């Protein structure tokens, strides 16, 4: 009489029972399914200890633990369980190692991990003051000569990147300035503010030459396409608007979010628009069709941080205590970053795969982009004369070389960071890395 196969053995056995051949078949199926996964050394020791408690033989062969399972052949039941510095790294199957231990059945959805590269720690080398309100936005011009900051004091200030000295103050907004961007193709700078306005500044005359009307509430973010003459802006009205820079006409209106859009970016190669919203979602939009391609619902709180890698087709998003990396253009989840105990307001990444994360409580994290490991954690310190609560970080940007970082903060200051000179892996090893099992959820 045939015996039904138990599809959920972890929840109990079928009442009809199961004979020994059926159990061996099911075990062999699991072994084949996970034959190319390898355990990190510390997990291999734990598994070996558990198997010893169950009375199953575990022997060491050339530094690799091999388990013999009763009821099956030795060649079909050897399991690689150690001898690797990376966690769950995939390797090419061979006849000598066709299968792994069936304790790996719970690890099927885990991501490949590798040891992170060493990065030098970062330190503050300059503090700039001059704004009379919270500094809410920053952008670096394409030639890497100066950068601009926008503030709640309604002004835009332009600073020399090398010396940190004030070059110019621009006035024109009647409320706080929340977004800035400099065109890589034209001598224009764009600004968005709480006055619902998007302004185009001629950098040769330092005057406003265009206004873009349409937003029904404050503009929180904007971005300029690197190759097309279009601009995207978004904000509290939950809509992203794409504009023709020259004619000021709206090209397309991207609607679908249910709450404030905190960040918006162009992904030039598709072309795509990526938006991060307070409705806890991230949307990827087809720019030509003006429709949503993908909605990412993995975050459980308002998504405030968004950054694109300058050399890869990947991007990262952040909300309270959660940062995630995604792949363009589909929006596939790549990895979860180490936790940061803060509501994260801003993310930035440079060419050297260093990602900066700044929180509303002054929490700062530096991450390895490839692995999600936080190699440095520190805290912003308010400048003298500020109250303790004024240590939030609102915006950040690396310069074009990736060697300097600029942060905008609630203490009305601008802080500039660089890698610690003469740092080595021996003198500054950073936070300890341990392999973890990240779930794709």
Swiss-Prot record:
The keyword Repeat belongs to this UniProt entry's keyword annotation: yes
Alphabetized UniProt keyword annotations: Cytoplasm, mRNA processing, mRNA splicing, Nucleus, Repeat, Spliceosome, WD repeat
GO biological process terms, semicolon-separated: mRNA cis splicing, via spliceosome; mRNA splicing, via spliceosome
Top-rank taxon, per record: Eukaryota
Location relative to the cell: Cytoplasm; Nucleus
WD repeats: 130-169, 172-211, 214-253, 256-295, 298-336, 339-379, 388-427
Biased composition (Polar residues): 83-107
GO cellular component: catalytic step 2 spliceosome; cytoplasm; post-mRNA release spliceosomal complex; Prp19 complex
Region (Disordered): 1-22, 81-107
InterPro entries: G-protein_beta_WD-40_rep, Prp46/PLRG1-like, WD40/YVTN_repeat-like_dom_sf, WD40_repeat_CS, WD40_repeat_dom_sf, WD40_rpt
Family, per entry: Belongs to the WD repeat PRL1/PRL2 family.
Task performed by this protein: Involved in pre-mRNA splicing and required for cell cycle progression at G2/M.
Description of how the protein assembles with itself and partners: Associated with the spliceosome.
Name of the molecule in the record: Pre-mRNA-splicing factor PRP46
Source organism per UniProt: Yarrowia lipolytica (strain CLIB 122 / E 150) (Yeast)
């Amino acid at each position: 009489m045939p015996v039904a196969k138990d599809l959920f053995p972890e929840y109990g056995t079928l009442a009809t029972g199961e004979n020994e051949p059926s159990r061996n078949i099911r075990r062999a199926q699991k072994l084949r399914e996970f034959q190319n996964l390898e355990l990190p050394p510390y997990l291999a020791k734990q598994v070996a200890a558990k198997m010893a408690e169950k009375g199953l033989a575990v022997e060491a062969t050339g530094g690799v633990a091999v388990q013999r399972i009763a009821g099956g052949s030795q060649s079909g039941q050897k399991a690689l369980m150690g001898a690797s510095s990376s966690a769950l790294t995939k390797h090419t199957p061979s006849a000598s190692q066709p299968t792994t231990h069936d304790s790996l059945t719970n690890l099927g959805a885990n991501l490949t991990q590798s040891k992170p590269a060493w990065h030098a720690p970062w330190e503050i080398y300059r503090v700039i003051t001059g704004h009379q309100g919270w500094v809410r936005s920053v952008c670096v011009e394409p030639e890497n000569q100066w950068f601009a900051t926008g503030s709640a004091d309604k002004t835009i200030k332009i600073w020399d990147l090398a010396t940190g000295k004030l070059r110019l103050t621009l006035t024109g907004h009647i409320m706080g300035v929340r977004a800035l961007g400099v065109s890589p193709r034209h001598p224009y700078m764009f600004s968005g503010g709480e006055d619902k306005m998007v302004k185009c500044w001629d950098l040769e005359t330092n005057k406003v030459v265009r206004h873009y009307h349409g937003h029904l509430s404050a503009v929180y973010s904007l971005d300029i396409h690197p190759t097309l003459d279009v601009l995207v802006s978004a904000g509290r009205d939950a809509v992203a608007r794409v504009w023709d820079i020259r004619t000021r006409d709206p090209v397309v209106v991207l609607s679908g979010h249910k709450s404030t859009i905190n960040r918006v970016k162009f992904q030039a190669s598709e072309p795509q628009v990526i938006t991060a919203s307070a409705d806890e979602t991230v949307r990827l939009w087809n720019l030509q069709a003006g429709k949503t391609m993908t909605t990412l619902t993995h975050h459980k709180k308002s998504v405030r941080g968004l950054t694109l890698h300058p050399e890869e087709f990947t991007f990262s998003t952040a909300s309270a205590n959660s940062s995630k990396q995604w792949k363009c253009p589909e929006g596939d989840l790549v990895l979860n970053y180490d936790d940061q105990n803060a509501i994260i307001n801003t993310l930035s990444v440079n060419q050297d795969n260093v990602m900066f994360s700044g929180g509303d409580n002054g929490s700062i994290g530096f991450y390895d982009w490839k692995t999600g490991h936080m190699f440095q954690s520190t805290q912003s310190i308010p400048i003298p004369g500020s109250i303790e609560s004024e240590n939030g970080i609102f915006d950040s940007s690396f310069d074009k070389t990736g060697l300097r970082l600029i942060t905008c903060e609630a203490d009305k200051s601008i802080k500039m960071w660089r890698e610690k000179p003469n740092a080595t892996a021996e003198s500054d090893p950073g936070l300890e890395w341990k392999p973890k099992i990240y779930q794709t959820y």
